[in-house]
UniProtKB/Swiss-Prot annotation:
Job of this protein: Potent catalytic inactivator of eukaryotic protein synthesis. It may be a component of natural defense mechanisms involved in protecting the kernel against soil-borne fungal infections.
Protein's name according to its UniProt entry: Ribosome-inactivating protein
Summary of subunit composition and partner proteins: Synthesized and stored in the kernel as a 34 kDa inactive precursor. During germination, this neutral precursor is converted into a basic, active form by limited proteolysis, which removes 25 AA of net charge -6 from the center of the polypeptide chain. Additional processing also occurs at the N- and C-termini of the polypeptide. A two-chain active RIP (comprised of 16.5 and 8.5 kDa fragments that remain tightly associated) is produced from this processing event.
GO molecular function, one term: rRNA N-glycosylase activity
Amino acid sequence: MAEITLEPSDLMAQTNKRIVPKFTEIFPVEDANYPYSAFIASVRKDVIKHCTDHKGIFQPVLPPEKKVPELWFYTELKTRTSSITLAIRMDNLYLVGFRTPGGVWWEFGKDGDTHLLGDNPRWLGFGGRYQDLIGNKGLETVTMGRAEMTRAVNDLAKKKKMATLEEEEVKMQMQMPEAADLAAAAAADPQADTKSKLVKLVVMVCEGLRFNTVSRTVDAGFNSQHGVTLTVTQGKQVQKWDRISKAAFEWADHPTAVIPDMQKLGIKDKNEAARIVALVKNQTTAAAATAASADNDDDEA
């Protein structure tokens, strides 16, 4: 994800601005009678109300990206014992942060960065790019599902300080199949468990909204005891959502265009892109938030 540089006037406006979400969608995570697919469909329906149609593009196009986000929505993920609220930008579907039951907002970033959330948020201490969350691993290594979402919500809801959640939970997690990997990761990075929980939510919620393929894959295995993962190809496509969106605009003007980097992703034309991607990022304005190149999104979350 490209870096965003805010002007002093933008900083002042954001500091004094309280976020008012356009809608809040509640997902009862442990309710087996409420399918993941219904949750994603409901959120998409509300997001589409703020999208536009673009001639030659099959999918709805998100609002133009802004340096200081103007449009937000919340998703409240509720388990039997706890809940967290995710703050998501409408213009690019990025997860910016989450709120605990105690009313504390945790935001991606660190000291010296500029807050986008109101209500005195705290920094998580790391960014929201996939490079920040999983390093050089592929997204096919991220295990998802109803049980994974439940654990993520319950653990993140207890977050009080920047690096203590991992220290408190790692012993309990030693009984999990990936315990050895978690223990090794926690030893190298005290934030490893928080990052692991967040990347699961980013893929299940944000990428589930962006991608038909992701939402279908997650839905098919959401109730599986062993969880569900993306394919290698799906993971690579997810990390190129911005570029796929740009290609959708190119195909709108030149329907028969051959776009080599799309072919590498298994996307030969706009029909194939529409099968894979549900919502397209707006490319019509040179928003400062987008920066120099759409190809910088290799590890955006």
